[in-house]
Regions:
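Short, flexible coil/turn micro-motifs enriched in small/turn-prone residues
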Residues: 1-4, 103
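Short, basic, helix/turn surface patches
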Residues: 57-68, 125-130
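Hydrophobic pocket/interface hotspot
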Residues: 18, 22, 84, 91
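Vicinal oxygen chelate
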Residues: 4-13, 39-42, 62-130
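A cross-family glycoside hydrolase active-site/sugar-binding cleft signature
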Residues: 9, 51, 75-77, 101, ...
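Core segments of cupin and vicinal oxygen chelate
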Residues: 2, 9-57
Length: 130
């Protein structure tokens, strides 16, 4: 059987702020931000989920939030070079921190990085057009 990623979990300090960011990114996130667990399916079937720190600590009493740096790095294919630039502009224009402005990477992609409300790296990319 081929290995297939099916679930990505994000532990968040502020569910509402995190969901607002990912909605702006383009995820079809349900409107219920007062629950300790929220999830949505991406177009490829991968489940993207959020859990509050309180919920994680109830499930794992020994859980300690990581300190320093980001906890997870995510990369979302934007489809086109222009979409990378537009998504970066939309997110940074809404006040989210841009870590790396859009640039043409030597591996053949347009690439940019924005931080989500929990400080996680969210990369935006698309293949460079020939």
């Amino acid at each position: 059987m081929a290995l297939r990623l099916g679930f990505i979990g994000i532990v968040t300090r502020d569910m509402s702020a995190s969901l607002t960011f990912y909605r702006l990114l383009g995820a079809a996130v349900p409107e219920r931000s007062d629950e300790p667990h929220v999830d949505t399916s991406l177009e490829d079937g991968t489940v993207l989920a959020w859990d509050t720190i309180d919920l994680i600590r109830r499930l794992d009493p020994g859980y300690e939030s990581p300190s320093g740096g980001h906890r997870i790095a995510l990369a979302f294919d934007q489809g086109t070079v222009n979409a990378v630039d537009a998504t970066y502009a939309r997110l940074t224009g809404a006040g989210y921190e841009g870590r790396t402005k859009p640039w043409d990477a030597p591996w053949g992609q347009r690439y940019a990085t924005v931080l989500d409300p929990d400080g996680n790296s969210v990369d935006l990319f698309a293949a460079l057009e020939n």
